[in-house]
């Protein structure tokens, strides 16, 4: 599971999150 993939799916998810939030959750 790639971090960038995780961030991508986080960003396009139902809940809008910032890149920073997604990066924090995915690392």
Swiss-Prot record:
Cystine pairings recorded for this chain: 6-26, 10-22
Keyword Disulfide bond among record annotations: yes
Protein's UniProt keywords contain Hydrolase: no
Key words of the record: Disulfide bond, Secreted, Toxin
Name of the featured protein: Conotoxin flf14a
Example GO molecular function: toxin activity
UniProt family annotation: Belongs to the conotoxin R superfamily.
One GO CC term, this protein: extracellular region
Domain remarks: The cysteine framework is XIV (C-C-C-C).
Expression tissues: Expressed by the venom duct.
Subcellular location: Secreted
């Amino acid at each position: 599971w790639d971090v960038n993939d995780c961030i991508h799916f986080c960003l396009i998810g139902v809940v809008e999150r910032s890149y920073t939030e997604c990066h924090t959750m995915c690392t």
